[in-house]
């Protein structure tokens, strides 16, 4: 088969195949997503997201776009910050994840606009949002550079992008982290979610994602300024921040 190639975990696939394969993974894990996140990270994902929410300097009435918002953890936090005067969009490219996220928010009495949206072709006008966030979603995108440019496009001048993503762990911990990721994680996926393969992909996709400095440069290339990052949990995850001027 012809066409441009890209990675799907450690495998090489045609670019036009990756989105479908990623979709299969998240259709499979959607119902158990929050449970698995708690188990896999020993609850740390909630700490990472809480830090991300506290990093944003939002005010009442601000507009926020949550990309790859999944089960709505960040959207929930953003909505509390911007109040009823504000606007928070929960978006995801995966219908199963979006349905779970919408239902979770509804169960808490939160009615937010939701959109089935591809981050590489965002259905929003230029210069609209004060904040764009993407948590644990960028690594699954086929054309990360295109997605980052789209995020920049929809931000108002002075607006902020926050990217929370798995990253490059400190070198002395690599051996233990690899054992956990490739030996234990798929077993947990099989026992809890009845799906070892999706969690094997998760481990592989983390290793293929750009490291902290590479992602920083990608954000600069996409049009962001004042780009910096903060490592958490020894570099297991990093929060990148960029501003559109």
From Swiss-Prot:
Question: Is Nucleotide-binding one of the keywords UniProt gives this record?
Answer: no
The record's listing under InterPro entries reads: SAM-dependent_MTases_sf, UbiE/COQ5_MeTrFase, UbiE/COQ5_MeTrFase_CS
* Pathway, per record: Quinol/quinone metabolism; menaquinone biosynthesis; menaquinol from 1,4-dihydroxy-2-naphthoate: step 2/2; Cofactor biosynthesis; ubiquinone biosynthesis
Listed Pfam families: Ubie_methyltran
Q: Which SUPFAM superfamilies match?
A: S-adenosyl-L-methionine-dependent methyltransferases (SSF53335)
What does the record give as EC number? 2.1.1.163, 2.1.1.201
List this protein's GO terms for biological process.
Answer: aerobic respiration; menaquinone biosynthetic process; methylation
Which reaction does this chain catalyze? a 2-demethylmenaquinol + S-adenosyl-L-methionine = a menaquinol + S-adenosyl-L-homocysteine + H(+); a 2-methoxy-6-(all-trans-polyprenyl)benzene-1,4-diol + S-adenosyl-L-methionine = a 5-methoxy-2-methyl-3-(all-trans-polyprenyl)benzene-1,4-diol + S-adenosyl-L-homocysteine + H(+)
In the record, what terms sit under GO molecular function? Answer: 2-methoxy-6-polyprenyl-1,4-benzoquinol methyltransferase activity; demethylmenaquinone methyltransferase activity
Q: What is the lineage of its organism?
A: Bacteria, Pseudomonadati, Pseudomonadota, Betaproteobacteria, Neisseriales
In the record, the note on similarity to other proteins reads: Belongs to the class I-like SAM-binding methyltransferase superfamily. MenG/UbiE family.
What is the name attached to this protein's record? Ubiquinone/menaquinone biosynthesis C-methyltransferase UbiE
Job description of the protein: Methyltransferase required for the conversion of demethylmenaquinol (DMKH2) to menaquinol (MKH2) and the conversion of 2-polyprenyl-6-methoxy-1,4-benzoquinol (DDMQH2) to 2-polyprenyl-3-methyl-6-methoxy-1,4-benzoquinol (DMQH2).
- Gene from which this protein is expressed: ubiE
Q: Kindly list the positions annotated as binding S-adenosyl-L-methionine.
A: 71, 92, 118-119
Keyword annotations from UniProtKB, A to Z: Menaquinone biosynthesis, Methyltransferase, S-adenosyl-L-methionine, Transferase, Ubiquinone biosynthesis
Organism, by scientific name, is Neisseria meningitidis serogroup C (strain 053442)
């Amino acid at each position: 088969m012809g066409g441009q190639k890209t990675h799907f975990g450690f495998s090489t696939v045609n670019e036009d195949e990756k989105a479908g394969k990623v979709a299969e993974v998240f259709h499979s894990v959607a119902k158990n997503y929050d449970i698995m996140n708690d188990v896999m990270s020993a609850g740390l994902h909630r700490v990472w997201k809480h830090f991300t929410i506290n990093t944003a300097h939002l005010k009442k009435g601000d507009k926020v776009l949550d990309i790859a918002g999944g089960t709505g953890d960040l959207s929930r936090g953003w909505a509390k910050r911007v109040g009823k005067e504000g606007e928070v969009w929960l978006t995801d490219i995966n219908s199963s994840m979006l349905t779970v996220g919408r239902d979770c928010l509804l169960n808490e009495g939160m009615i937010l606009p939701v959109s089935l949206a591809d981050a590489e072709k965002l259905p929003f006008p230029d210069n609209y949002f004060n904040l764009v966030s993407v948590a644990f979603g960028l690594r699954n995108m086929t054309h990360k550079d295109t997605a980052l440019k789209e995020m920049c496009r929809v931000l108002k001048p002075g607006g902020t992008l926050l990217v929370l993503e798995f990253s490059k762990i400190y070198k002395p911990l690599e051996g233990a982290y690899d054992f956990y990721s490739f030996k234990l994680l798929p077993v947990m996926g099989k026992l809890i979610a009845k799906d070892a393969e999706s969690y094997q992909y998760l481990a592989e996709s983390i290793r293929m994602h750009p490291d902290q400095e590479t992602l920083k440069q990608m954000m600069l290339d996409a049009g962001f300024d004042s780009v910096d990052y903060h490592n958490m949990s020894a570099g297991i995850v990093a929060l990148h921040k960029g501003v559109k001027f």
